[in-house]
C-alpha cells in the first residue's frame, strides 16, 4: 500500500514535469518579444523572467520577476504568483511584497484555457497600457471583470489624477532597475538570467554571427547601452533588410515584364521576316 502510494506520487511528479516542459514549449511558440522566462534548474515550479520595455511610460526599463507555480500545477485552480525583484510603481504591483495582481485577467486557473505565456502577455499589457489595465478588463475566457481594488492605491490615484507625478514615480523605478541590472545574482541557479556589460573582446564574435548583410557598425555605442537596446538594433537591422528586399521585388518583376515584352516583340519581327 505504501509502495503503491509512493509510486503514484512519483508518477504525478513526472507528469507534472512534462506539463511544465509543455508550458515552456508553448511559450517558445508564442514568440513574445522583449519578455523572457524559463523554469529554474532547481524546480520547474519556479520560473525566472525578465521584461524589456521600449515604448510608453515605462520605456527604457528592465524588470526582473519570478513566477511561482502552485504545488499541484496545473490541476490546482489557484493562480500562480508573480513577484518582481525590485520595486515597480504600478497600480497592479504591491509596493510591499512586489507581487503582481493577476485577478484582472484570471479569476482562477483553468488548465485547459490558461498557460504561462498568457501571464507574460498580461505583464506586457499592464506596462504598455497602464490606464487600460485598471479599467474594465476581459479575461482570456471572455469574462468581463470590473476592477474595484488594486494592489497599489497610490499609483492608481496618481495615474488618474496626476499623470506627471505618476510618470515621475515610474522614472524612479526605471532608474533603479537599470542601476541594478548587473548585480550579482541572488541565487546560484544555473538557469538564472544574467546580464553583463558589453565587451568587444568577449561578445564581439557572437555579435558578428548575428549581423545581417546591411548591419551598421554600432559597437562603440553599444558599449554604454542596455542589452535591450542592442537587441532592438538587431531587430531594426533585420527589419530594414526585409524592407529593402520587399522594395527590390517590384523592380525585379518590372524588369522581368519588360524582358518578356522585348522577347515577344522580337518573336513577332521574326515571324514577319
Swiss-Prot record:
InterPro entries named among the record's database cross-references: UBQ-conjugat_E2_core, UBQ-conjugating_enzyme/RWD
Xref: PROSITE patterns: UBC_2
Disulphide bridges: none
Residue span(s) of domain UBC core: 15-164
Domain of life: Eukaryota
Pfam families membership: UQ_con
Family, similarity comment: Belongs to the ubiquitin-conjugating enzyme family. FTS subfamily.
Entry protein name: Protein crossbronx-like
Amino acid at each position: 500500500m505504501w509502495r503503491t502510494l509512493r509510486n503514484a506520487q512519483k508518477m504525478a511528479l513526472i507528469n507534472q514535469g512534462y506539463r511544465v516542459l509543455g508550458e515552456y514549449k508553448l511559450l517558445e511558440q508564442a514568440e513574445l518579444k522583449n519578455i523572457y522566462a524559463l523554469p529554474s534548474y532547481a524546480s520547474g515550479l519556479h520560473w525566472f523572467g525578465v521584461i524589456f520595455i521600449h515604448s510608453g511610460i515605462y520605456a527604457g526599463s528592465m524588470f526582473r520577476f519570478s513566477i511561482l507555480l502552485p504545488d499541484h500545477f496545473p490541476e490546482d485552480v489557484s493562480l500562480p504568483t508573480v513577484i518582481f525583484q525590485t520595486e515597480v510603481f504600478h497600480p497592479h504591483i504591491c509596493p510591499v511584497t512586489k507581487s503582481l495582481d493577476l485577478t484582472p485577467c484570471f479569476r482562477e486557473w483553468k488548465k485547459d484555457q490558461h498557460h504561462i505565456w498568457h501571464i507574460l502577455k498580461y505583464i506586457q499589457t499592464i506596462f504598455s497600457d497602464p490606464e487600460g489595465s485598471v479599467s474594465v478588463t476581459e479575461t482570456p475566457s471572455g469574462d468581463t471583470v470590473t476592477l474595484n481594488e488594486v494592489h497599489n492605491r497610490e499609483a492608481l490615484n496618481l495615474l488618474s489624477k496626476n499623470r506627471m507625478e505618476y510618470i515621475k514615480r515610474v522614472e524612479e523605478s526605471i532608474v533603479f532597475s537599470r542601476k541594478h541590472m548587473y548585480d550579482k545574482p541572488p541565487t546560484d541557479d544555473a538557469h538564472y538570467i544574467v546580464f553583463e556589460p558589453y565587451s568587444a573582446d568577449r561578445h564581439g564574435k557572437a555579435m558578428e554571427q548575428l549581423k545581417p548583410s546591411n548591419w551598421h557598425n554600432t559597437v562603440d555605442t553599444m558599449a554604454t547601452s542596455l542589452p535591450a537596446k542592442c537587441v532592438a538594433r538587431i531587430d531594426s537591422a533585420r527589419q530594414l533588410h526585409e524592407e529593402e528586399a520587399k522594395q527590390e521585388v517590384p523592380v525585379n518583376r518590372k524588369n522581368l515584364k519588360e524582358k518578356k515584352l522585348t522577347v515577344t516583340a522580337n518573336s513577332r519581327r521574326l515571324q514577319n521576316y
